[in-house]
Amino acid sequence: MDRPLRWLAIALALFVANAQADSSVPAAPRVSASTWLLADFDSGARLAAHDAGRRVAPASLTKLMTAYLLFEKLRSGKWMLGEQINVSPRAAAQRGARIFLVPGQSVPAETLLQGMIVRSANDATLALVEHVAENERAFVVEMNHKADEFGLHGTHFVNATGLDAAGHYSTANDLLILASRLLRDFPEQYRRFAVREFAYQELKQYNRNALLWRDSSVDGIKTGRTQQAGFCLIASASRNGMRLIAVVLGAADEAGRVSASEQLLDYGFRHFETRLVMQGGEPATRVRVWMGEASELPLGLERPLFVTLPRGQHAQLHTRFDVGQLLTAPIAAGERVGFLGVALGDKPIAQVPLIALSAVDTGNILQRAFDRIQLWAQ
């Protein structure tokens, strides 16, 4: 998560924590899992959490990072969905969830991708990884570099499948960031996580995410289970334009991870709402610029700003602009020149940078002289 978004998410998390102390927002449900987290996708606000920073085995949730890198390489043209991939003996021998690949056979790349996402197949996963990288070890190096890039400081990968291994771990916090990045950066690929069944060589297998059948608002994202990890599930649901993500790790069984996810999602949708405060890249206000070719500068946000708040309180939401200094040219497009403050009633809940939406070059001698006279006269 880049710095402005992390800062905003922290501010919103603190606000939501305070809101939960209000009698209008009940405490989060007690769910049976070792660590869990509920968050809003658009605002990044954490609505409820338990031990979300603890390092645990992530099981096949690992494949979210594998998928992210595969999607990156697909977008850049390093592989294609229509090409054929030869299955290595090592890929075919993978234990755990499989689509029963045979060494030496040639399989369409898209079939392998669907097998990895829908069935969480380890043989399909490794066949893809070996195709796009020198070997699994080289691919895992890329996975850890990407984890560092995303700020996943509680995460380290040892393999691409999620099988239990010493030094292979993540946290609910980190997995939320990873899942959110995948949804945001590859919306065209995210639809694959909603596919309920997968057929290969006349064998039909089903998506292990039971919520795809139980809740029509759920459209992904991934299950996992190993002896060390227990039963895990990251579920995303969208209702009335609001998207939530629930991360449940270390449940005792399949029913436990499903129940925990359902309870968390229902709690979030029932008691919170997310509002768009301002679009990104559009003028929010205009300010005076001195010593420049132009006398006014449009200010706005880098990206859309959403806030999550207790239901029914959006009428109390208001904003203010704080530039706080005389702006003098030159000013570059994208330069941070102030802040947008957001409050709910008298409680500040967010503050994000205002940027210049256009550049203002230094004015000519006459323009600068005229502005100096105006400033002197003030």
Question: What are the roles of these predicted feature ranges?
Answer:
Residues M1-R6:
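Positively charged n-region of N-terminal signal peptides that target proteins for export
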Residues W7-V16:
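Bacterial N-terminal signal peptides
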Residues A11, L64-A67, Q263:
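A general marker of short, structured functional hotspots
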Residues A11, P26-A28, A48, R75-G77, ...:
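Generic marker of residues within folded, mature protein domains
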Residues A19-F186, E197-Q201:
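Active-site-adjacent loops and short helices of periplasmic peptidoglycan-processing enzymes
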Residues H153-H156, D164-Q378:
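Domain-terminus/edge residues, biased toward the C-terminal soluble/receptor-binding domains
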